[in-house]
Amino acid sequence: ILIYNADGQIVDSWTLGFRSAHGLSLIHEQGRDVLFICDYRSQSVVKTDMNGNILMRLPTAGELGIYEEPYKYLPTGTAIASNGDIYVADGYGASFVIQFDRHGDYIRHFGGRGKKPEHINQAHGIAIDGRSIKHAKA
């Protein structure tokens, strides 16, 4: 992670040792900035402070028992709702979106590969606006 000031100068850098970091969300909560970082190779989604301290690690699909083939969980992006709910896009895996509450507790998952309107093929990224969840279909 490289942190720049407004003049474009690097003021800090750190690493979590991820080999395939992919997807980064920056939010402001409780008076501080935090990051949500995905690493699809290790099936990890972590929340960190701006110094790289891990504040939370979300459970994997395998740990939750929600995928028939847990190795197909490859998270690529996150979006955080105004109520703190965390949405994880499984872009390189089974193409589900997994919803957690602000504490990292599983709520539900939806989407997945298929040809019906409710399916998502390659849920690579995700964003939330004030009205609804938006996702890109590939």
Question: Where do the protein language model's features map onto the residues?
Answer:
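A detector of repeated loop/turn-to-beta-strand junctions in beta-rich toroidal repeat architectures
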Residues: 42, 72, 93-94, 98, ...
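A short beta-strand motif characteristic of beta-propeller blades
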Residues: 9-15, 56, 62-68, 108-117
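Short loop/turn segments that connect beta-strands within beta-propeller blades
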Residues: 5-9, 49-53, 101-105
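Structural signal for beta-propeller blades
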Residues: 1, 43-46, 55, 95-97
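Beta-rich, blade/repeat-based domains predominating
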Residues: 17-33, 63-85, 115-138
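Residue position within the beta-strands of beta-propeller blades
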Residues: 37, 88-89
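Short loop/turn segments immediately following the C-termini of beta-strands
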Residues: 40, 83, 91-93, 131
